[in-house]
Amino acid sequence: MINLKNVKPILTPRFTPSCSDALMEKLSEIQKKYHLPMQSHLSENFGEIAWVKELCPNTHFYGEAYSQFDLFGGDCPTIMAHCVHSSDEEIALMKKQGVYIAHCPQSNTNLASGISPVRRYLDEGLHIGLGSDIAGGTSVSILRAMADAIQVSKLYWRLVDSSMKPLTVEEAFYMGTEGGGSFFGKVGSFKEGYEFDAVVLNDSTIPTPLKLSPKDRLERLIYLSDDRNITAKYVAGRKIL
């Protein structure tokens, strides 16, 4: 296979209802041969979960529809989008297998899928990052995803479970950087030994008469900035903008 430094292939079965057993078996063979990662989506809404159960009556929960083909973490690095309504058994298997969750708050809101219990995932030590799921969202901005994640976590706390505290700015920022970046290796952090993948943001276009701390400035950028605030981009230490 072609070895590109910054662009790598990933297996992407759309979701269980659109994939035959024969296809999943073949994907499993390809994964084991080339040691590829896999991405799909999981437990996004109740209708989908019921549909998967109907199609895969031998499974106890949605995640088993992937794990029965060895496509659910472990030796197969896996990202699962959404995980809005994952059962206790499914969550336990995701944690055991090291499955990454891509939280897509804007998509989940637009499609009325529900609110993912992100606080639980963080507290239980699952790997979780942020996604846009642009097919169901309106923006590919990870800063926007951070703001959306904080906002929907407040709704979950207020409307669903008052014991699940809303996300902090720091937690949302972590999810949008190292939380998801760690799936790809040592990216998403300024720690020693990590690749310098970064953007430079200029907040001078968001004026305020107040004296702000670095955290305050970051929070304003998360909520108020857009691509016009990006003044430079670096990939693996190389400036590309």
Language-model segments: which ranges?
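Metal-coordinating catalytic core of metallo-dependent amide/deamination hydrolases
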Residues: 1-83
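Divalent metal-coordination and catalytic microenvironments
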Residues: 11, 41, 80, 94, ...
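Helix C-cap/helix->beta junction micro-motif
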Residues: 33-34, 97, 124
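Short, acidic/turn-prone active-site loops that include or flank metal/cofactor-
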Residues: 44, 105-109, 134-136
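His/Asp/Glu-enriched, well-ordered alpha-helical/loop segment
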Residues: 68-74, 119-207
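C-terminal active-site-proximal or functional interface alpha/beta core segments in diverse enzymes
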Residues: 80, 88, 108-115, 139-140
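Long hydrophobic segments that form regular secondary structure
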Residues: 86, 90-99, 104-109
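C-terminal cap of metal-dependent C-N hydrolases
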Residues: 195-241
